[in-house]
Swiss-Prot record:
Superkingdom to which the source organism belongs: Bacteria
Family statement drawn from the similarity comment of this UniProt entry: Belongs to the universal ribosomal protein uL3 family.
Keyword presence, rRNA-binding: yes
HAMAP family: Ribosomal_uL3_B
UniProt-listed InterPro entries: Ribosomal_uL3, Ribosomal_uL3_bac/org-type, Ribosomal_uL3_CS, Transl_B-barrel_sf
GO cellular component, one term: cytosolic large ribosomal subunit
UniProt entry keywords in alphabetical sequence: Ribonucleoprotein, Ribosomal protein, RNA-binding, rRNA-binding
Protein name as it appears in the record: Large ribosomal subunit protein uL3
Biological process terms in GO annotation: translation
Recorded name of the encoding gene: rplC
One MF annotation (Gene Ontology) recorded for this entry: structural constituent of ribosome
Function: One of the primary rRNA binding proteins, it binds directly near the 3'-end of the 23S rRNA, where it nucleates assembly of the 50S subunit.
A Pfam family of this chain: Ribosomal_L3
Length: 218
């Protein structure tokens, strides 16, 4: 594990736009509403066996929160929130229950890792799901233009090997994109502008953390 101090926050992907850098070049960015979050629990190595901080984000009607979750928020002394996530840190002593976590934690951060749920595409064929070339458009091909093709042997081995790329459910997976550059931090609006695309749909929940690999070597 690297010696980089890991910081993290929960946020909502708002969509993509573009900005201009210092040299007037167009930079595509994803706008993330990062926080504000609140610390609902601090895990320590002595009690829990590891160091982590639990943060909560998003408003929710208290009547829609079940009793176990309601009790958890009440114990922390905070109002109920819609989303909860746990961020592993090297040292959790700097956090306190009830403390606010805002986008300001990324003021001195250049690169981040973003985790979200990728767009779901439902049941998809081999060409869409894996980028297969497909088969010939003519010359004897009959209703098999987009089929996968051969998937293995015959009597030997008598089965299809595990991991064979075939048609199936595509997307809706937890995905992490690493070493994305922070283009801008807007503390007044709780917005984080990240260069490039991040996983998920507009309005999807994402976890933004300090890049564990330290960012690109520039």
């Amino acid at each position: 594990m690297s010696d980089i101090e890991i910081k993290g926050i929960l946020g909502k992907k708002l969509g993509m736009t573009q900005i201009f850098d210092d040299e007037n070049r167009v930079v595509p960015v994803t706008v993330v509403e990062a926080g504000p979050c609140v610390v609902t629990q601090v895990r320590t190595k002595d009690i829990d066996g590891y160091e982590a901080v639990q943060i909560a984000f998003g408003e929710i009607d208290p009547r829609k929160v079940n009793k176990p979750e309601s009790g958890h928020f009440k114990k922390a002394g905070v109002t109920p929130r819609r989303h909860v996530a746990e961020i592993r840190v090297a040292d959790a002593s700097g956090y306190e229950v009830g403390q606010d976590v805002t986008v300001e934690i990324f003021n001195e951060v250049d690169f981040v890792d973003v985790t979200g749920t990728s767009k779901g595409h439902g049941f998809a064929g081999g060409m869409k799901r894996h980028g297969f070339a497909g088969q010939g458009a003519a010359h004897g091909n009959q209703a098999a233009h987009r089929r996968v093709g051969g998937i293995g042997g015959a009597a030997t081995p008598g089965r299809v090997f595990k991991g064979k790329r075939m048609a199936g459910r595509m997307g809706n997976n937890r995905v992490t994109m690493q070493n994305l550059k922070v283009a801008k931090v807007d503390t007044d609006s709780n917005l984080l502008l990240i260069k490039g695309a991040v996983p998920g749909i507009n309005g999807g929940i994402v976890v933004v953390k300090t890049a564990v690999k330290g960012g690109a070597k520039a």
